[in-house]
């Protein structure tokens, strides 16, 4: 089926089993595996009436195209993965924290950003449909399960989505080396959507024009930039830190 895509490894498969088991079409388990993690997968799959097939290592290697699968591969129905941004925003119990990826095309970077987003409690990751990496097996593997837990929402018109976020009272904060304030000397808003630009070119002009703030990340060494997932982790962590301090003062 065109909507099916593989996921592999215990992190990705277990996260999908617990978060969205109805989207799993079938699982393949390596013959002879009987360790605790494999038994857990088999038990959960049986409870959810998911088809399980046992296959040799060569078959699993072929399915995963040589990637490290740990003896477990699944196929999911990607059409059951869709999440609406409005539903996310209207069902939050705290101010929204979003991550916007403007043209991140490397699946390894997307996977790392999703993993970072999960760790920092990001409510959704948003990206334009064009010129962005899509969810695939590589992304799921790198994300270590976060691709199954963090809503990844692609939009046809990013500028329009940014305007809609502002209507919810969410500040759009861009990361830029020439930002008017640096990360450690700015008072960050409670409701925030951080924008990370393309690995090579940064944010697109129209995206930049929709930002309410431009913030730079201080650099103390000789390199001029960091991996996008590292930068995302820094700004999201600082946002969480400031929230904690504000709550302690209440």
Swiss-Prot record:
One of its GO terms (molecular function) is RNA binding. It catalyses: guanosine(2251) in 23S rRNA + S-adenosyl-L-methionine = 2'-O-methylguanosine(2251) in 23S rRNA + S-adenosyl-L-homocysteine + H(+). Its EC number is 2.1.1.185. GO terms for cellular component: cytosol. S-adenosyl-L-methionine binds at residues 197, 217, 226. Its main location: cytoplasm. Gene3D superfamilies: 3.30.1330.30, 3.40.1280.10. Keywords: Cytoplasm, Methyltransferase, rRNA processing, S-adenosyl-L-methionine, Transferase. It is found in: Cytoplasm. InterPro entries: 23S_rRNA_MeTrfase_RlmB, Alpha/beta_knot_MTases, Ribosomal_eL30-like_sf, rRNA_MeTrfase_TrmH, SpoU_MeTrfase, SpoU_subst-bd, tRNA_m1G_MTases_N. Specifically methylates the ribose of guanosine 2251 in 23S rRNA. Belongs to the class IV-like SAM-binding methyltransferase superfamily. RNA methyltransferase TrmH family. RlmB subfamily. This is 23S rRNA (guanosine-2'-O-)-methyltransferase RlmB.
